[in-house]
């Protein structure tokens, strides 16, 4: 199953459900006046893609992911982001299933911009050059839900959520966050999950 339009772009991210992560996210947000839409939510970013991605492969891989354990490199603050006014607080992740998902999503819009895109957990953004120190336990086991979003030229966001009990739901919203009717291939993707 392929995304039909080569201009169709999106990302795969896991939405974390862990009290420690959310406490850290609040700490970041309380120190930052910056707003980056979905990037304000604590999540694991897997990869970016623009074409030739088999959605079924992504969904089948995710289906076996919950719950998962992940090794997190601690005290790794990254400030390398395209926005010169902001620093992103993120940590790298080591997990075989996450690596598999990342390998599926290796068709980047611009590999010169993103030559290596490793799975990482993003907590939020701070003003550029902000000193921020944090320490996490390593390894850190994560019980998570999964959110996969496909953005059609950033007009509509197609979001699938698989809960830890492997039930799932689907929502499609426009750029203003209002619900819209989904397209046919989404239902086909769900039919191949199990």
Predicted regions and their residues:
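Histidine-dependent nucleotide/RNA phosphoesterase domain, centered on the 2H-phosphoesterase fold
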Residues: 1-193
């Amino acid at each position: 199953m392929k995304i039909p339009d080569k201009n169709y772009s999106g990302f795969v991210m896991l939405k974390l459900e862990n009290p420690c992560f959310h406490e850290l996210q609040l700490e970041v947000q309380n120190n930052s006046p910056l707003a980056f839409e979905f990037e304000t939510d604590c999540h694991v970013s897997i990869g970016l893609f623009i074409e030739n991605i088999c959605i079924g492969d992504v969904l089948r891989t995710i289906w076996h992911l919950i719950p998962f354990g992940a090794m997190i490199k601690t005290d790794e603050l990254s400030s390398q982001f395209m926005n010169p006014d902001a620093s992103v607080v993120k940590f790298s992740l080591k997990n075989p299933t996450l690596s598999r998902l990342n390998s599926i999503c290796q068709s980047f819009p611009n590999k010169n911009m993103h030559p290596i895109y490793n799975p990482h957990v993003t907590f939020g953004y701070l003003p550029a050059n902000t000193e921020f120190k944090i320490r996490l336990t390593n390894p850190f086991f994560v019980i998570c839900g999964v959110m996969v979003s496909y953005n059609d030229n950033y007009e509509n966001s197609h979001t699938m959520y698989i809960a830890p009990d492997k039930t799932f739901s689907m929502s499609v919203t426009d750029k203003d966050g209002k619900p819209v009717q989904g397209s046919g291939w989404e239902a086909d993707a769900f039919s191949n999950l199990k």
